[in-house]
Swiss-Prot record:
GO CC annotations, alphabetized: cytosol
GO BP terms in the entry: trans-translation
Keyword terms: Cytoplasm, RNA-binding
Subcellular location per the Swiss-Prot or TrEMBL entry: Cytoplasm
Annotated NCBIfam families: PRK05422.1, smpB
Protein name per UniProt: SsrA-binding protein
Family according to the record: Belongs to the SmpB family.
Functional note: Required for rescue of stalled ribosomes mediated by trans-translation. Binds to transfer-messenger RNA (tmRNA), required for stable association of tmRNA with ribosomes. tmRNA and SmpB together mimic tRNA shape, replacing the anticodon stem-loop with SmpB. tmRNA is encoded by the ssrA gene; the 2 termini fold to resemble tRNA(Ala) and it encodes a 'tag peptide', a short internal open reading frame. During trans-translation Ala-aminoacylated tmRNA acts like a tRNA, entering the A-site of stalled ribosomes, displacing the stalled mRNA.
SUPFAM superfamilies with a match to the protein in the record: Small protein B (SmpB)
CDD domains attached to this UniProt entry: SmpB
Record flagged with keyword rRNA-binding: no
Species assigned in the record: Limosilactobacillus fermentum (strain NBRC 3956 / LMG 18251)
Chief localization: cytoplasm
Length: 157
């Protein structure tokens, strides 16, 4: 079990993409390792990561994480990393083949949902997702509001 800090939050959670669950319907999730440089892992441990605009894509049979911002390390020197560079994702070959087959469908993409540390290694939770239409988002908001209303009424009984 992950360690909890004094606020009750998961101590190993680095960043979370809350907007992804709102904008996409996530059908499946995969845990992948990241290939990072020294200054990148230091910035990750300092929780200076933004997953908001990120996505994963195949290039030459390898899966790459694109457009994820890992801030430059403050104590870095001229060898500091580029904050938006593409980072290689590490998955088993079987998982890569499965993902490559599923990503061929129209409208399906791979988005990062969470980044966390597991046994000292940076991991990213990827979601196989399909984009929601505007009316899907409105229906989700309407359903959430109805659930809240039911909870309020049931609280008094």
């Amino acid at each position: 079990m992950a360690k909890k800090n004094h606020q009750g939050l998961d101590a190993n959670l680095i960043a979370q993409n809350k907007k992804a669950r709102h904008d996409y319907t996530v059908t499946d999730t995969f845990e992948a390792g990241l290939v990072l440089t020294g200054t990148e892992i230091k910035s990750v441990r300092a929780r200076r990561v933004t997953l908001k605009d990120g996505y994963a894509q195949f290039h030459n049979g390898e899966l790459w994480l694109m457009n994820v911002h890992i801030a430059e390390f403050a104590g870095g020197n001229i060898f500091n990393h580029d904050p938006l560079r593409n980072r290689k994702l590490l998955l088993h070959k079987k998982e890569l083949k499965k993902l490559q087959g599923e990503l061929t469908a129209k409208g399906v993409t791979l988005v990062p949902l969470k980044m966390y540390l597991k046994h000292g290694y940076a991991k990213v939770l990827l979601g196989l997702a399909q984009g929601k239409h505007e009316y899907d988002k409105r229906n989700a908001i309407k359903k959430r509001e109805q659930d809240r209303q039911i909870d309020r009424v049931m609280k008094h009984y």
